[in-house]
């Protein structure tokens, strides 16, 4: 349980109405300790500024922009890849950043700064060269474009749009563009020429051709706004738009129809009532299912005929359509119809829209995995919800007032997330708890210290272990002395590094000293330094021609290096997958969407990061919003690596999948020096891996996309292995003291 004793004391002693207010009364040391673990309000008092700068500078965004010193800001954001949370601070200190920052820092900050014409002139003077200014300007934001008079070149426009397609909108509003350029952008990028530069090129056929390319209602409306009215009254244009409306593109043409098609209501058919009040008696029409689907989005225009529409829906068993207009048909909904809507409709309906909140309806909602089950609390007690297997604690619940209505819901939340700084921060500092609800929350947490509320199931889960004060302890590396009396051959390898402080060089030195490696064994290594360049010469490990054996031995090396504090970041396979972040934020996670490479590649020293630098390295590599701990980053590395070697290894393996999986796990444990044996079957994992193998072998792609939850059993296995790794590591080092 997160310790809230000091916060509770401050809350009671100072008669605070919010937990945020109580946090401001904490002693600085106590406050900083909580801030370090990510447990803090959405803003901080100025009194904590110096301590935050010294101990957790990445949290400077919690102060008002004017409180943050420019140099402190620049020093902090220079080290971070993801600076989204500093957006207002970056714009506030724009001038200091432009004057002080180098090109890479300015590029990083451009999306957040409101750039003026004077700023562009300054950037041109600072960074001479067309390519430099074009590259920097490609990161400009739309707010800047709306405020400047600077005219972008066609090359600059293309560069900006290549980076962010939707920047065409402010650019096209900003300046008149050549018609040939506009046509090219339409053909190449599908960008509608909503610009006065195209007006002279428009005629009915061209207007229709452009409308055929439109994919956003807003673009259709804005394009028709610039067209000459005489051309909009042409019959060919009217006929095309009427047919487009009948195809379902209703919201593309609402302003146009009201201005130009009042005399064509008969041609609009059932859709006429959307634009003109009760223009058509729809009871005289033969209404198709497609038409019902289209008008259901605009059912408020058909209230006169709602009974007629409902009769057609029920006669034809169109449950999906009934669900889409549920708020307009409350009187006809029985318990049976509510259950059918829940079970048969493609999209979930809001529980608040179900007029009957019976236990049976609730059970159906639970089975269909509804996220707003909490709304049944208006009729059903929380114990019944839990007994039936409901989880009323979801993202949706934060959008309601239920936490202030039910103290039992807060208690349930604490049982689920009381160990998790991120999730408790959301409820305590970001949700508008009443004073009474805040008091109950603090009292419950303070009176249930330790892990008493999390026994027996939660304490052995990976999310719990990631949020608790664990760490991975490494074995000391037995450094060996350099041997200089070596005669080299031409086949020897040479690696050069630009600095002695180079992290890849440091990793290489440590790797060379770790005993027992199978594939990353560099023989007879020597170093030569010259002009700040250091060259490493060594005899490479002999190639292993058996692919399956090479993969297994390579995984052994990765695990063995991890046991000595050198962790492999598999970002060339998984470019954006960080399951640990989801877990510490209390969110569900699924398998990666894509594996970038289907071949297990050779290892390089720069891919291994020392444990003490791992949190920063992983956070920057994946551009996370905040820096995770070294311990959390290590688990992310181990879990990602194990997943990759299971998936890609099984694709390359010629062994029976079950034997391969068990062998991989055994090797992984052996490399980490963990005495564990898997006690559960892996048949479900094998089925998943075999399906991936079949799919990969039937194509010739160098990468593979994964469906959601396609590797759920495999991920569960990886989680369990990580849990065993954490528990074994901490227990082993405790017992060895």
Curated annotation (Swiss-Prot):
Keywords: Acetylation, Disulfide bond, Early protein. The keyword Disulfide bond applies. The keyword Nucleus does not apply. The modification N-acetylmethionine is found at residue 1. InterPro entries: Poxvirus_E2 (IPR007585), Poxvirus_E2/O1 (IPR021155). Induction: Expressed in the early phase of the viral replicative cycle. Disulfide bonds join 496-535. N-acetylated on initiator methionine by host. Interacts with host KLC2; this interaction promotes IEV trafficking by engaging the host kinesin-1 complex. Interacts with protein OPG056. Plays a role in intracellular enveloped virus (IEV) transport to the cell surface on microtubules. Together with protein OPG056, forms a complex that interacts with host KLC2 (kinesin light chain isoform 2) to engage the kinesin-1 complex and thereby promote IEV trafficking. Belongs to the orthopoxvirus OPG064 family. This is Protein OPG064. It comes from Variola virus (isolate Human/India/Ind3/1967) (VARV).
């Amino acid at each position: 349980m997160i310790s809230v004793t000091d916060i509770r004391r401050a809350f009671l002693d100072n008669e605070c109405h919010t937990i945020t207010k109580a946090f401001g009364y904490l002693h600085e040391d106590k406050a900083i300790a909580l801030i370090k673990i990510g447990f803090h309000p959405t803003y901080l008092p100025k009194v904590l500024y110096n301590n935050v700068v010294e101990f957790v500078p990445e949290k400077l965004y919690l102060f008002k922009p004017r409180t943050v010193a420019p140099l402190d800001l620049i020093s902090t954001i220079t080290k971070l890849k993801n600076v989204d949370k500093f957006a207002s601070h970056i714009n506030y200190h724009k001038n200091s950043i432009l004057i002080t920052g180098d090109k890479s820092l300015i590029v990083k900050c451009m999306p957040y700064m409101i750039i003026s014409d004077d700023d562009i002139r300054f950037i041109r003077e600072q960074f001479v060269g067309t390519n430099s200014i074009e590259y920097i300007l490609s990161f400009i934001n739309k707010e800047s474009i709306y405020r400047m008079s600077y005219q972008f070149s066609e090359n600059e426009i293309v560069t900006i749009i290549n980076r962010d397609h939707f920047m065409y909108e402010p650019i096209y509003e900003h300046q008149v563009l050549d018609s040939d350029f506009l046509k090219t952008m339409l053909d190449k990028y599908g960008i509608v020429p909503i610009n006065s530069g195209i007006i002279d090129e428009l005629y009915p056929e061209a207007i229709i051709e452009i409308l055929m390319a439109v994919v956003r209602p807003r673009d259709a409306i804005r394009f028709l706004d610039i067209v000459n009215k005489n051309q909009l009254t042409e019959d060919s244009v009217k006929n095309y738009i009427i047919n487009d409306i009948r195809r379902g593109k209703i919201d593309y043409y609402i302003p146009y129809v009201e201005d130009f098609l009042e005399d064509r209501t008969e041609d609009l058919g059932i859709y006429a009532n959307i634009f003109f009040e009760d223009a058509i008696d729809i009871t005289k029409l033969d209404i198709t299912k497609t038409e019902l689907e289209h008008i259901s989005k605009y059912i408020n225009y058909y209230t006169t005929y709602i009974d007629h529409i409902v009769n057609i829906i029920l006669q034809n068993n169109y449950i999906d359509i009934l669900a889409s207009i549920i708020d307009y048909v409350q009187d006809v909904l029985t318990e049976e119809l509510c259950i059918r809507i829940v079970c048969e409709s493609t999209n979930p309906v809001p529980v608040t829209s179900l007029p009957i909140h019976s236990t049976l309806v609730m059970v159906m909602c639970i089975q269909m995995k509804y996220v707003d089950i909490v709304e049944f609390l208006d009729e059903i007690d929380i114990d019944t919800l839990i007994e039936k297997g409901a989880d009323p604690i979801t993202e949706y619940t934060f959008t309601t007032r239920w936490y202030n209505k039910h103290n039992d819901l807060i208690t349930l939340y604490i049982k689920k997330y009381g160990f998790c700084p991120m999730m408790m921060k959301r409820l305590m500092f970001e949700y508008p708890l009443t004073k009474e609800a805040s008091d109950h929350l603090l009292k419950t947490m303070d009176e249930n210290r330790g892990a008493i509320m999390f026994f027996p199931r939660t304490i052995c889960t990976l999310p719990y272990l990631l949020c608790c004060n664990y760490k991975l302890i490494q074995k000391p590396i037995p450094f060996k002395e350099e041997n200089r009396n070596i005669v080299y051959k031409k086949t020897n390898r040479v690696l050069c590094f630009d600095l002695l402080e180079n992290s890849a060089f440091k990793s290489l030195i440590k790797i060379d000293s770790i005993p027992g490696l199978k594939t990353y064994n560099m023989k007879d290594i020597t170093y030569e330094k010259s002009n700040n360049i250091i060259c490493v010469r060594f005899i490479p490990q002999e190639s292993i021609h058996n692919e399956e054996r090479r993969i297994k031995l390579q995984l052994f090396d990765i695990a063995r290096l991890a046991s000595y504090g050198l962790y492999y970041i598999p970002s060339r396979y998984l470019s954006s997958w960080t399951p640990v972040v989801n877990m510490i934020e209390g969110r569900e996670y699924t398998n990666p969407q894509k594996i970038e490479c289907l071949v297990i590649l050779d290892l390089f020293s720069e891919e291994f990061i020392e444990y003490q630098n791992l949190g920063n390295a992983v956070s920057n590599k994946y551009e996370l919003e905040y820096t995770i701990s070294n311990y959390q980053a290590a688990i992310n590395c181990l879990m990602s690596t194990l997943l990759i070697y299971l998936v890609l290894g099984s694709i390359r393996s010629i062994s029976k999948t079950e034997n391969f999986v068990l062998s991989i796990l055994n090797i992984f444990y052996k490399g980490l020096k963990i005495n564990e044996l898997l006690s559960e079957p892996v048949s479900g994992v094998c089925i998943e891996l075999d399906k991936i193998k079949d799919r990969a072998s039937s194509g010739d792609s160098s990468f593979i996309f994964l469906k959601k939850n396609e590797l759920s059993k495999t991920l569960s296995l990886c989680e369990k292995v990580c849990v065993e790794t954490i528990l074994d590591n901490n227990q082993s080092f405790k017992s060895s003291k």
